[in-house]
UniProtKB/Swiss-Prot annotation:
Classification lineage: Bacteria, Pseudomonadati, Pseudomonadota, Acidithiobacillia, Acidithiobacillales
Pathway entry: Isoprenoid biosynthesis; isopentenyl diphosphate biosynthesis via DXP pathway; isopentenyl diphosphate from 1-deoxy-D-xylulose 5-phosphate: step 5/6
GO molecular function terms noted in the UniProt entry: 4 iron, 4 sulfur cluster binding; 4-hydroxy-3-methylbut-2-en-1-yl diphosphate synthase activity (ferredoxin); 4-hydroxy-3-methylbut-2-enyl-diphosphate synthase activity (flavodoxin); iron ion binding
Record protein name field: 4-hydroxy-3-methylbut-2-en-1-yl diphosphate synthase (flavodoxin)
Domain of life the protein comes from: Bacteria
Binding site for [4Fe-4S] cluster: C270, C273, C305, E312
Organism: Acidithiobacillus ferrooxidans (strain ATCC 23270 / DSM 14882 / CIP 104768 / NCIMB 8455) (Ferrobacillus ferrooxidans (strain ATCC 23270))
NCBIfam families linked to this entry: ispG_gcpE, PRK00366.1
Length: 366
């Protein structure tokens, strides 16, 4: 049940954040940001490792001080994922983290001091092959732009972004990606669409300050979905007032839904009704908890009855259609067994892990 996406992605320049390619024909990357105190090295490393475990491509860390920059050096040595340092105002912090192995910078060249200070940062970034993300936010536009437009508008966000781009252009630096984030979906979507018409740099998508787990997921799915459907976007972050791990999970769910990237188990499940032959909701919750460590793409269908269950099961890699006391198990489109309803979770987990092991063995032999 693996579908090619009908979406034709916008062609952009390609950059690299560490080992991760962004733009061009590279897969859309999913990233998050730590919410620990960066100087708390143990907590920050632990959180990054949790993000790594669920498939984060890139992790951003706020580095607001030289003390935090010192901590960053130790953090960098203890994790594998490419790290982006989020820096404001003090160019010395940018210089320090570049010496200590940062993979990318999130700065706005216009707010880290004089042109000479900006030049120092840009020259080192160029020398070390470190890309810069220009991050414009509707809540922190420059004073003159606020006065010009009166309020955040798509044109205001794009003008701010292009102002920062022009500084890097003047310094002959083009290893750049850009974001123009807002908490309002319509503002953010319009700004990204306008920006995409003016530059060929890769774009980092996000609906900033989207809200808690439920409301933030909905806002991000709508906003990012609209842009991704237009072929706009090379890397995404789902901003949630929640565990950053959820940002990665939701991000991949958005990409899976649009057939833009497959990672992990794609669970297809009915919402359940009185026809269900087993407790679908409890079963799905248990499966999600047991299978969250799996990054291998696989479609698994779990439907509570045979009305839609058989058709869905035949389309999935592994599928189950509910039956009276015993449900029907399908593997690669064919019925292979009947499963006691009390054993569904155990049997499906075993089948899924066996299928993954077989795939990995086949790839290794190849």
């Amino acid at each position: 049940m693996h579908h090619e996406s009908p979406i034709r992605r916008r062609k952009t320049r390609q950059i690299h954040v560490g080992k991760v390619a962004i733009g061009g024909d590279a897969p859309i990357s999913v990233q998050s940001m730590t919410n620990t105190e960066t100087r708390d090295i143990a907590a920050t490393v632990a959180q990054i490792r949790r993000l790594e475990a669920v498939g984060a491509d890139i992790v951003r860390i706020s580095v607001p001080s030289m003390d935090a920059a010192e901590a960053f050096k130790t953090i960098r040595a203890q994790v594998e994922t490419p790290l982006v340092a989020d820096i404001h105002f003090d160019h010395r912090i940018a210089l320090q983290v570049m010496e200590d192995g940062v993979d990318g910078l999130r700065i706005n060249p216009g707010n880290i001091g004089s042109l000479d200070k900006t030049r120092l940062v840009v020259e080192m970034a160029k020398d070390k092959g470190i890309p810069i993300r220009i991050g414009v936010n509707a809540g922190s536009l420059e004073k003159d732009i606020q006065e010009k437009y009166g309020e955040p508008t798509p044109e205001a966000l794009v003008e701010s972004a292009l102002r920062h781009v022009s500084i890097l252009d003047e310094l002959n630096f083009h290893d750049v990606k850009i974001s123009v984030k807002a908490s309002d979906i319509f503002l953010a979507v319009s700004a990204y669409r306008l920006l995409s018409e003016k530059v060929d740099y890769p774009l980092h998508l996000g609906i900033t300050e989207a809200g808690g787990l439920r409301s933030g997921t909905v806002k991000s799915a709508i906003g990012l979905g609209l842009l991704l459907r237009d072929g706009i976007g090379d890397t995404i972050r789902v901003s949630l007032a929640a565990d950053p791990v959820e940002e990665i999970r939701v991000g991949f769910d958005i990409l899976k839904s649009l057939h833009l990237r497959q990672k992990g188990i794609n669970l297809i499940a009915c919402p359940s009704c009185s026809r269900q032959e087993f407790d679908v909701i409890t079963t799905i919750n248990a499966l999600e908890a047991r299978l969250e460590d799996i990054l291998e793409p696989m479609d698994v269908s779990v439907i509570g009855c045979v009305v839609n269950g058989i058709g869905e099961a035949k389309e999935a890699d592994i599928g189950l259609a509910g039956g009276d006391k015993r449900s029907i198990l399908y593997y690669r489109g064919k019925q292979v067994d009947r499963v006691e309803n009390n054993d569904i979770v155990d049997v499906l987990e075993k089948r899924i892990r066996a299928e993954i092991a077989e795939r990995q063995a086949t790839r290794h032999e190849g």
